[in-house]
Amino acid sequence: IARRYRPDLCVISAHGVNRVAGATVESFEDASIKREFAGNSAELVVMAGREKLGFVATYQIAELDNISYLITDGSSSEIADLESDRLTIIKVGE
């Protein structure tokens, strides 16, 4: 079903966000659906709390270079490893 949609913006949560693995989740079904929507959208927004930064879950949703925005409550030191030219990091809760 997800492959029929071409959203301008896809907003998803992740169990882990890591420079090498990108955005990841623990469930195969969750990953399959999120990966399909993420791949079909013009921009991808990933939400991940500070405890999920640097963590790698079992299944990849998207590579870091394919994420447009990361919304997190992580500190500057926690997000330093994730910064890139393509990724805009939005810090909340400070």
Question: Model-found features: residue ranges?
Answer:
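Conserved phosphate- and dinucleotide-binding cores of soluble alpha/beta proteins
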Residues: 1-94
